[in-house]
Amino acid sequence: NATMIVALGNHDSAPSDVAAPSNLPDGLADQLSWDWDNVAALVKSEGWGDNVTSEKIRTHYGGYSISPRQGLRVISLNTDMWYRKNPFSYLNIDNPDPSHMLRWLTDELQAAEDNNERAWIVGHVLPGWDGGDSIDNPTNLLYHIVSRFSHTIAHSFFGHKHEDMFHVWYESQSGNSSSVSRETQNARAMAFIGPSITPLSNVNPSLRVYHVDPETYEVMDYSQYYTQLYDFEKLNKTGPVWELLY
């Protein structure tokens, strides 16, 4: 049986793009707790996780960790916490982790290291300094975390861009973009950035099947599929036909 892993995107809240850290005063932190409650209830009702998983989702902004196979820990993050369109990202901006989500990620990676597990990090908005998606301070801290646990992290997986991309994590010396040496010998990990099912941004819907080593949990290859939007009108009774792209 396949295990469903849920990772919240920036359109999975109402209003969109918003996630509030739990340390806001005057009850402001609770204004989106209904979202985490709904996700927790969905995961439990669909059998994608147990009571422990459901409680993690409630207390980590929709994020959680799960071990679908022996030796593998999957850590799902709510990446709206570093998304540039989230207005709450700019409160206490000098603090790279006001939500303590990255502290929790570090704890999960430490537990994986202690248990000789490999880890997958799953999220929506990818980190980076291009100014397009994520703010700098959380990105700086996340690079430090990945550098520290690069031997434990098998891979990370993101989306959001609606395009077929990849991201290389490099050794971070002092936690800012200018200190990162983008030389081959300083590469520490990589992230797969999958294209989207939605045709938004004028793309054909796509899906990806990863081929994974069952011992190391490294991705050895993947198959990229797509379906032609032009064919949808004549497929209204059968659904899309997926074709192998490469």
Model-derived regions: residue spans:
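Catalytic metal-binding/acid-base residues of hydrolase active sites
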Residues: 10-13, 126-127, 157-164, 195-198
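A short helix->loop->beta-strand "cap" motif at the edges of active sites that frequently abuts
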Residues: 2-3, 151, 186-189
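Metal-dependent phosphoesterase/phosphodiesterase active-site architecture
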Residues: 27-111, 115, 163-246
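A short acidic (Asp/Glu
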Residues: 16-19, 130-135, 165-170, 203-205
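Divalent metal-coordination and catalytic microenvironments
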Residues: 9, 77, 105, 121, ...
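Short, electropositive alpha-helical surface patch
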Residues: 18-35, 132-146, 174-178, 192
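Active-site-proximal segments of metal-dependent phosphoesterases and phosphodiesterases across multiple
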Residues: 84-103, 110-158, 168
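Core catalytic region of metal-dependent phosphoesterases/phosphodiesterases
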Residues: 1-21
